[in-house]
Curated annotation (Swiss-Prot):
Keywords: Cell cycle, Cell division, Cytoplasm, DNA damage, DNA repair, Septation, SOS response. One of its GO terms (biological process) is negative regulation of cell division. Residues 39-90 form the LysM domain. It comes from Listeria monocytogenes serotype 4a (strain HCC23). It is found in: Cytoplasm. Belongs to the YneA family. This is Cell division suppressor protein YneA. Its main location: cytoplasm. Disulfide bonds: none annotated. One of its GO terms (cellular component) is cytoplasm. PROSITE patterns: LYSM (PS51782). Inhibits cell division during the SOS response. Affects a later stage of the cell division protein assembly, after the assembly of the Z ring, by probably suppressing recruitment of FtsL and/or DivIC to the division machinery. NCBIfam families: PRK14125.1 (NF010723).
């Protein structure tokens, strides 16, 4: 079979498969790039992962133990110890953290 004969017979299928491949690549890039919406917080003196869990676990819809495990895993904290001045990523979407902070700020005015 020549290329012309293959194209004439299967052009709809070829276009469909190529479209699916392109859309799949776009979808994969979108999903991989969308993982950056988690908040980053600075650790203060005397803070621990459990203190961060007390403060933020309610905004993440996770149990405190799950929150601590997630933070340890995502921030590569083998012993679960954090030091003052460190930044850690927490499983709270940036929009949730900003909304709650602005509400508190408005209430204080």
């Amino acid at each position: 079979m020549t290329m012309k004969l293959i194209w004439d017979k299967f052009y709809v299928s070829i276009i469909f498969v190529l479209t699916c491949i392109v859309l799949g690549i776009i979808l994969m890039c979108t999903v991989v790039g969308g993982g950056n919406d988690y908040s980053e917080v600075n650790v203060s003196e005397g803070d621990s992962l459990w203190a961060l869990a007390d403060q933020y676990a309610g905004k993440s819809d996770m149990a405190k133990a799950d929150f601590v495990s997630w933070v340890e895993k995502e921030n590569n904290l083998a012993d679960g110890h954090v030091e003052a001045g460190e930044s850690v990523v927490i499983p709270v979407h940036k929009t949730k953290l900003i909304k709650s902070d602005s509400t508190i700020q408005l209430a204080n005015q």
